[in-house]
Amino acid sequence: MLKLHNVYAGYDGSDVLKGIDLQVEQGTTTCIVGPNGAGKSTVLRVLSGLLKPRVGEITFDGQSIVGLSPRQILALGIVQVPQSHSLFPGLPVRENVRLGAYMLHDTALVERRLREVEEMFPIVTTRARDRAGSLSGGQQRLVEFARCLMLDPRLIMLDEPSMGLDPKTFKQVIETIKTMQSSGRTILLVEQNARTGLSISVNGVVLESGRVRLEGSHEDILNNPEIGHLYLGGTLSNA
């Protein structure tokens, strides 16, 4: 279980997160939605060790992760697929995926994980020798998903996974996320598009100005008229 309690964090002395309380149960999928500047991506930066909170407690399975380095957090099984592409464009697809297991020193284990990931993501096999830079944005996103699974993570954080995708690739990404859900992994995703993110989540959290405005099931949030002012076009169900 992931728990944040009274977390304040920000940049240059200005808090972006202002007393965040959040709980993500093991094996569930939770989506954070909200307008630009609400603090969605800042939550992920704090959880990945890239930003230290000024105040507050963060625990993962009962262990405090405040002050841990990104590498230490990765070793706990917490991985993130960032919003911007993070592949090495000059390396082949399969080698990019293999690098996801750089912390593992058991060659046989790495190869076994690679085979498992190839079954889940056919693109790792069909484009194995192609340079990652030759792939479309959506294809690169699929490869990034594959790479993040090489460490068999316990918590996967996705920062706007549907951003900039064509309809066909978007459908592939959604199916991939659902496959990861069925494997029992815990998923925390951030989405600008409320309907997209909440439709594939069990739970949702709405952030407004660095604070939790509403949390509950995706149906509760989509149908709540009180938060329509956060989005153009009225309520979240119309977003």
Regions found by a protein language model. Give the residues of each.
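Conserved ABC transporter NBD signature motif
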Residues: 56-64, 76, 110-114, 216
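Conserved ABC ATPase signature
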Residues: 131-135
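The feature captures the beta-strand-to-loop junction immediately N-terminal to the Walker
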Residues: 33-35
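Conserved structural motif at the start of ABC-family nucleotide-binding domains
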Residues: 2, 17-19
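Helix-to-loop junction immediately C-terminal to a conserved catalytic motif
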Residues: 48
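Conserved catalytic motifs of ABC-family nucleotide-binding domains
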Residues: 152
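ABC ATPase C-loop
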Residues: 148-149
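ABC-type ATPase nucleotide-binding domains, specifically the catalytic core motifs of the NBD
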Residues: 12, 30, 68, 91-112, ...
